[in-house]
Amino acid sequence: MKSIPFTLLFVTAAILGAATFVENARGTAFVREYAYATWWFKALWMLLAASAAVVLVRRRMWRRPAAFVLHAGLLVVFAGALLTAFTGHKGLLHLRQGEPASSYVDEKKRVAHLPFVLTLDSFRVEYYAGTSAPSDYVSQVACHDADGTLIARPRISMNRIFSAEGYRFYQSSFDEDLKGSWLTVNHDPYGTAVAYTGFLLICIGSLGLLLDPRGGFRRLLRHPLLRKGGLFALLCLLAVDGQAAEPLPVVRRAQADSLAARQVMYNDRVAPLNTLCRDFVQKVYGRSVFRGLSPEQVVASWMLYPEEWNRVPIIRIKNRELRERLGIRGEYATLAGLFDGTTYKLQPLWQQEMGKHSQLGRAIQETDEKAGLALMLTQGTLVRPLPPGTPRLSEQQVRAELLYNRIPFNKILFMANLTLGFVAIGLFLYRMLKRRGENRTSRRLWTAALWLSTLFHAAGYMLRGYVSGRLPLNNGYETMQFVALVVLLTACLLERRFPFVRPFGFLLSGFTLLVAHLGEMNPQITPLMPVLASPWLSWHVSLIMISYALFAFICLNGLLAAGLMARPQHRHDALVRERVEQLTLLSRLLLYPSTFLLGIGILLGSVWANVSWGSYWSWDPKEVWALVAFMVYGAAFHRRTLPWLRRPLAFHLYMVAAFLVVLMTYFGVNYLLGGMHSYANPS
């Protein structure tokens, strides 16, 4: 009986993962109709919950209050989800200015009636100062009861809902003439409240398991191999181009540099001209320096001498087939070379590749974007002065952004950390094989290097936050930066007692920053979309990213432990056995905060989703894979029910395999499946 819940747990996790791939192939409507909304899917969850409840009772879990509250919270959340599924209703309400409405269309296209009347007084789009980037969408509404008595005049906007008599209204869309507004209607009188109660119980239970003196986490902290050192502090964390260059008319360096601090409109925000120039040259040429010229020199010279600069090979085309089709030698094309008289050479090529999703098609799109930027520059539409009345950046803000642009924090760090990481792991393995300890001078030097790397990265990350005016967690590039920072901080807290954590910290942060540098992530600083301007989102992303960083440490622990146990003589080597035991204990210890942070992060994301668009769960691929990760890591705590997890090798291999789910959650969804949470997939 005790193994039935875990059999159902793994079966459910496998079905959830498979459903995301079916959704990617057949569409969201298909997978909802044939999976998420089916009787057998609900029955599977009910069986899982019922079997878990039976085990809780048979084991008298209430004798362990923290664990009981946590598991009870999970069951309460499930009960809330069932109530939402069977008693909740959602739909859309269309309001036109001055026209009263008392009904809406539900998800099944049926007309449902409201016990009151709503009238749209006005709708407006609010923008970031001096830009065309929306900061909010606002509906001013009047609410009257059936007798015509005014109940309220609410302001409904993104992340600001209106509730009346069990109905909640969320800003969803608007009419093009700005005289109509679409509101999402959610009537869930029981499910949401019950689910939120479960959320609270899960948080209380998680905290209780961390603080319970007789709990597994505190017992691990008291283990002789882990007692020394500052481990408890973990709880407080929670070149000039070489191509031949023809003489070019170029603006003098001093003149161009004087333009760097000029404030312009860029990416729908106020920014120094240096930011625009740097991003333009990086985008078009692939590097921030062209033939030894500063970005400001390139942009200013191209604007002043367009005829000459249009014939300069500066537009990088990485795809060999496209270069051959265009008849271009080398990797760089001229803007003039993309035209044959008045004919744009990319147009017929794009018509041939449109809809094929081929590498050539993507290369054509990328080159077209670069050509478009160059044309905007020559036509004088790329550099936009500030509109009258636009608030200007302070001198301190301008200096901060110029400093951020001039110091390549990301590039310096990934190169330095990867180099130090490989050297550190080599020295660590050499000392272990030779059975030599680390001398004090070496330890101090490596510790200093780790702290310097951490402080340098923290300075760059905080500088980016100051420049953007928000917590830098808006896109894939910024979340990768945050993960690297958490990895480095964790390594700093653990390395004194566990020297093998040091190379892990360098390597993990280095590879994370390398992915951010090389991947398809956008490092430009942009304003937040209205729905993203929520503190719930910031906490949701922060906690989940911290959990991912800790899971990465557990994975590397597993790889190192498996490597040590693969040696034939490990059974007879006391030092190796002690190292393996240390790695096992450390992984089990980190499993507590990492899994709890992931779970609480998922819950906060549900609250954010409910506040923003009226649904605390929507079976988006990112949500599904985060839930799968929580289920997979949650199973690892149950060594009594799953005795094979007591064997060190099996435990470490399971942790390595579990991290593949985390990689799928972050990278797989972003680049393969898409969805509302995807940073990279245009779908």
Spans of features found by a protein language model:
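Solvent-exposed, non-transmembrane regions of integral membrane proteins
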Residues: 1-683
